[in-house]
Amino acid sequence: MNKDNTLYCSAYRIAFFSEIGIGISANSCLLLFHTFMFIRGHRPRLTDLPIGLVALIHLVMLLLAAYITEDFFMSSGGWDDITCKLFIFLHRFFRSLSVCDTCMLSVFQAIILCPQSSHLAKFKLNSPHHLSCFFIFMSIFYTSISSHILIAAIATQNLTSVNLIYITKSCSFLPMSSSMQRTFSTLLAFRNVFLIGLMGLSTCYMATLLCRHKTRSQQLQNSKLSPKATPEQRAIWTILMLMSFFLIISTFDSILTYSRTIFQGNQSLYCVQIPVAHGYAAFSPLLVLNNEKRLTSLMISMYDRIVRLESLCS
């Protein structure tokens, strides 16, 4: 039985850290791409800043997750209460930034696409300012609901204690009373329903506008659209796929979070939730890079420069 547990832990550890490695590499590439585009003086799209910001947030979040989860498999030792509170709260904080920035990206894209006759059109001129304030407010609100971590997270002193909810081998959560458990469950449900609902509405709105635009174009041309999509259409489809992927992951993660709240201390649910919770951060940049045609142009331009430098040196 111990041998089976060891094999299971080894396989799970390899799978999880493979996901983390893919996510760190992909987010680094996406962040470097946007940095190079800015340095080269290319005209940025309105969605470039939120996408670059979410890549940076995901990069830091995955690094924190790797450090915390390593303690899940093998105790790092030397973790006191302050260390536990700091790392777990920082991880939750960057997760909140990820969710809020993704929500902002979805709403921002919907405002950009809305026609002049829409009520959302009045936000177009001031949308960056308004959305920045919305991002800050939602990040504070999202993080404040998880502020109980600063009290509940403690260093694990006794591995045999049945009163603690184990997070890693060095950190645990103090159990909550039934009233506090119901309160936080309600707040978590409200938070997730609000943000996921807002992203769902903006995603459906963008999909409706895209289908309407496609139908009108077909009617004007009296034929099917060219199979080659325009940069605007590719950008819209990228955001739509990104939002759809996020909504699926968030819904699944919310179900697991609620289940863990009900069945406190269930390690199996925790093992399932860890890779699910980081799935969006790990694989979303691959989706963006795959649909980013400017990346090909940048690579060709860099290759031409390298060839020219080599020819000059020779």
Where are these regions (language model features)?
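Transmembrane helical core of 7TM receptor-like proteins
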Residues: 1-314
